[in-house]
């Protein structure tokens, strides 16, 4: 077999956003690529016809691009971007015939420039696809734009943007210049944001023709994670604008969010929901009803539901199905039917639901050998665009006729969801052809095993040239994060790097994951370090029992809750020859209040000064005297989901026990490994760590 070079990571193309035109004739999508010479990441916006008559056309190449959205008539394409001068010549220009090379040195500085920040801020940009030419910048908000939506007639946009007072602006400027951090907020940190401030996000209405902008004073945000979720504005057919916000007495002390609507002139604010749930993704139907998601703010293991508000009451479309809306799902209306994505066992399924029937059928994404990552349905209801990830092909854009979807058979909602495999998908892209030519991509198998009376599923990856039955192969157990997540067959550079070097990779869907129903997920609620440990150990024993892997050559890694699980596994068992807990939490008691997860911890374990025993029971550090496994521990220097101090504690505890350990901290990195050089470094270090403690390598 041919090893995948780690430097080939620079050839990886990731698919992040898809948006289908109103008539279904084109798909806009965003890819993320890496620049080796500059060690940077670029996001590019593309358009491709759905009939496959032309190859994808790249509209942007440098800077960033995200969240493309077509105007209602399909003539313009709006998106969010942070772009440097001199591309941004004008703000809200009205004469599209002017020379785009016009010198802007005599113009007044923009709000973003006046703010004194050298980095470009994220703004709304527009392509006029009928006239052609480069995109032009529509907004010029000082702190950028977080989200937007089109007015149904296409003449205006509603945008969500921060709007600091003079005092708040002065503080933000002092912070940018290295001044002291000052906060009175309970949610004092947020991963990916850093230390939070008091600046409020509002909705603004922007005229597309001249760029004029008006703030809706009553449409403002609030809540612990507001800086991440945004206001999620949606402009409806009745003229009203829907958005989400938390208006509780102490919005940082709850995960509850409500859905509001308001007139575009800022009058007649209404709250549609009861203040008891976490609501999100408001999406209008043509008849004026409003769909959105609803989840339990106190128990995050409960399924997220799709619900509809008809002007008087709210009805759940998925409550009886015992499955959760997938985390990557959007809500899409066709007439009075809602199309969305559900998590079901080890895969994501496209389903249709109505108020009268609930979920009445399911379209399976051409077999269960790939992951369905995204969905968008054209406004005319003719065509659906899908983002699919195949372990051997990569991430790509597909389309399917909605009429073909609706030919799928009805399902018995008391039984398992069926599998339909119509040959109707049309592939529009081949984003990772160059990468695939460098080695064989892994084969995928689904495996099952028993654990405490439960049937557990896992996804197993191996090189197609590997003879699994020979039984002497090294195994890597890769544990998903969340834990409110799940694994499904997916394209992964890390999987390919490992399998091309002879490793078998197992990704177990342990109890606590969200794709097997309410009872399965709640097995882990408040019980960290119990059920998932049993499920992982049983999965390893299953592969050993099948004769696929060498019991002395079992290794592990996991990121976020996967790292947390690694901490439990190495302090409770000795199944690993070496392990790599990444960006994890190993003592929730000392972690409480140092990151952004105080509401999460309180919902599962209570308050540490009131429930110290519960925190003690879920601390991996308490069992560190049993640790013998060599550990490669990683952390992000600015990770406020799983703070780096947690990795330091585990590292020092391991060294005190005389266990081989290495700590890697990525400066300025949050709960992620973003830069390509760091992603390559991470994989190189993990591979070297495994090799150093592989008995077969030692014998050789």
Where are these regions (language model features)?
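Active-site-proximal cap/loop segments of hydrolase catalytic domains
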Residues: 511-700
């Amino acid at each position: 077999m041919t090893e995948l070079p780690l430097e080939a990571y620079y050839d990886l193309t990731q698919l992040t956003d898809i948006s289908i035109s109103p008539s279904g004739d084109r798909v806009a999508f965003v890819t993320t690529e890496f620049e080796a010479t500059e060690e940077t990441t670029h996001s590019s916006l593309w358009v491709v016809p759905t009939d496959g008559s032309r190859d994808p056309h790249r509209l942007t190449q440098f800077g960033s691009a995200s969240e493309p959205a077509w105007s209602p008539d399909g003539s313009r394409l709006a998106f969010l971007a942070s772009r440097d001068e001199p591309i941004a010549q004008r703000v809200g220009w009205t004469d599209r015939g002017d020379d785009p090379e016009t010198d802007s040195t005599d113009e007044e500085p923009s709000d973003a420039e006046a703010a004194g920040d050298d980095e470009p801020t994220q703004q709304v940009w527009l392509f006029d696809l009928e006239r052609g030419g480069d995109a032009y910048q529509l907004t010029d908000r000082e702190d950028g734009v977080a989200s937007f939506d089109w007015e149904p007639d296409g003449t205006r946009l509603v945008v969500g943007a921060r709007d600091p007072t003079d005092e708040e602006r002065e503080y933000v400027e002092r912070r940018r210049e290295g001044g002291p951090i000052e906060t009175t907020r309970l949610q004092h940190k947020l991963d990916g944001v850093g230390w939070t401030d008091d600046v409020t996000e509002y909705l603004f209405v922007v005229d597309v023709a001249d760029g004029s902008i008006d703030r809706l004073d009553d449409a403002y945000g609030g809540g612990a994670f507001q800086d991440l979720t945004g206001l999620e504005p949606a402009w409806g057919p009745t003229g009203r604008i829907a958005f989400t916000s938390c208006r509780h007495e102490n919005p940082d002390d709850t995960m509850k969010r409500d859905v509001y609507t308001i007139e575009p002139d800022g009058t007649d604010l209404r709250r549609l929901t009861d203040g008891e749930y976490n609501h999100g993704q408001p999406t209008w139907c043509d008849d004026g009803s409003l769909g959105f998601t609803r989840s339990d703010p106190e128990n995050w293991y409960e399924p997220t539901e799709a619900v509809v508000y008809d002007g008087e009451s709210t009805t759940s479309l998925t409550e009886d199905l015992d499955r959760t809306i997938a985390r990557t799902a959007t809500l899409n209306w066709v007439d009075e039917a809602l199309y969305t994505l559900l998590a079901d066992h080890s895969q994501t399924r496209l389903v249709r639901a109505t108020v009268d029937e609930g979920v009445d059928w399911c379209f399976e994404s051409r077999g269960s050998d790939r992951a369905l990552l995204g969905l968008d349905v054209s406004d005319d209801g003719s065509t659906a665009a899908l983002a699919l990830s195949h372990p051997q092909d990569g991430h790509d854009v597909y389309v399917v006729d909605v009429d073909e979807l609706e030919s799928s058979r009805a399902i018995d909602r008391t039984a398992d969801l069926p599998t339909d495999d119509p040959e109707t998908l049309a592939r529009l892209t081949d984003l990772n052809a160059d990468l695939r030519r460098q080695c064989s991509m892994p084969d995928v198998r689904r495996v099952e095993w028993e654990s405490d009376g439960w049937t557990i599923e896992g996804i197993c990856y191996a090189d197609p040239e590997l003879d699994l039955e020979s039984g002497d192969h090294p195994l890597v157990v890769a544990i998903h994060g969340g834990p409110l997540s799940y694994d499904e067959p997916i394209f992964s550079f890390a999987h390919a790097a490992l399998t091309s070097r002879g490793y078998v990779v197992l990704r177990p869907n342990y109890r606590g994951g969200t794709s097997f129903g309410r009872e399965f997920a709640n097995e882990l609620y408040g019980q960290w370090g119990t059920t998932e440990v049993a499920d992982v150990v049983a999965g390893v024993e299953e592969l050993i029992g099948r004769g696929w892997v060498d019991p002395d050559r079992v290794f592990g890694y996991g990121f976020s809750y996967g790292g947390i699980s690694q901490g439990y596994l190495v302090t409770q068992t000795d199944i690993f020859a070496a392990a790599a807990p990444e960006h994890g939490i190993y003592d929730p008691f000392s972690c409480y209040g140092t990151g952004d997860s105080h509401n999460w911890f309180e919902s599962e374990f209570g308050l540490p000064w009131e429930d110290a025993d519960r925190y003690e029971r879920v601390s991996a550090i308490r069992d560190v005297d049993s640790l013998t496994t060599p550990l490669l521990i990683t952390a992000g220097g600015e990770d406020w989901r799983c703070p780096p101090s947690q990795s330091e504690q585990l590292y020092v505890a391991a060294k005190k026990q005389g266990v081989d350990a290495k700590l890697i901290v990525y400066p300025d990195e949050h709960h992620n490994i973003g830069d390509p050089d760091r992603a390559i470094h991470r994989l190189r270090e993990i591979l070297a760590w495994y090799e150093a403690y592989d008995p077969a390598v030692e014998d050789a």
